[in-house]
Amino acid sequence: MRAAIAVADPLANSASRLLLSTNRTIHVIGAGLAGLSAAVRLASVGQHVVVHELARHAGGRCRSYFEPALGLTIDNGNHLLLSGNHAAIGFLKTIGAEDKLAGPRESVFTFADLATGERWQLRLNNGRLPWWIFSKARRIPRTRARDYLALLGLLIAGRDHSVGEVIDCTGALYERLCRPILLAALNAEPPKASAQLAGAVVRESLARGGAACRPLIATDGLGAAFIDPALAYLRGRGAVVRFDHQLRRLDLAEDRVGALHFGEDVIELAHDDVVILAVPAWIAPTLVPELVAPKQFQAILNAHFAITPPPGLPSMLGVINGTTEWLFSFADRLSVTISAADRFNEAAREPLAHTIWSEVAALTGLDGKIPRWHIIKERRATFAALPGENARRPGSRTRWRNLILAGDWTATGLPSTIESSIRSGNRAAEIVTRTQFW
């Protein structure tokens, strides 16, 4: 007989109780951050978790690997976190990897203009009252305090509105702050992007003050920060992680999933077993045919250069009026990120690498001779953060009572980010622990 017991949730702030079956199995399909965060949260309260991953490694679009062309271990994409990303920080605390992020003690963002050679810093004060906008030394050059009031429109924007319909996408504030920040966060050119998602970015960053807006980077790589410690945590709590294990079909009965088909391997589900489907947005509808999910995606391009950064270079530099958009400085390399990069999908890599390096050399004062380089084009890095695509994001629950969705493409209220992925996994785990499935 399977028993249900009430257990306090160490990860939750509420006083509510959890319904936990002592011997049911939670099958998590996908070992990206959404799946790993769900698995970690469930394992932390004693649930039996089995993670099934198609690839031979975990992490999905958030992982590290050794690149022979550079002779270095790199991330498949550069990711910036903020100190106010409570789900991501909480996840790292749980798996014992909070010390893997590094950043300034204050909220400081450095920018450079390739066209004029100008440089400036945005310096937020710690409190929620944004007195920094009244300081010329802290706000964006050529802007006035009242210019920032325009951002309030994003906080109340409806789901159908684009950024260009809500704020003026011209002028110093837009070109020197809004466009770089929103382009990076949304991975879409802001004028056509979802104003609602842009509002969420502003609400969770600038509007919360500098204490929540310190930039943080995984200096030793995403794998060392998020993936390897999560796998160790899961295995230490009895979870099973199966790689090279592709889910090919779900047996979808009237109100529940009855079985999981992994080729010749078929797992029949017990009456209280649960499935968390944490696969990419383009895969989920092939497994759940009636599922509505985003259909358009945007690329991100990262260029890595095997060279020691010069002294004094900030760990992250925002760039305007160039191909380069963000320059990240690591101990053994310089890395450039370009968002909404579909225009480069078919571009020849070598000329593009030389173009990017010429900008990096100008920004850093390094020799113009290009070092060893490697370009990664992630063609479906994020769902397209457009109003119509945002409206297609499903909630976590499905009409099958033991099938739950997770992923940054679900309706988290945030764009496609690490924080969104982890929140979706946490939400899926919360549904599991607070719902009776039998």
Provide a role label for each language-model segment.
Residues A43-P68:
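Glycine-rich FAD pyrophosphate-binding loop
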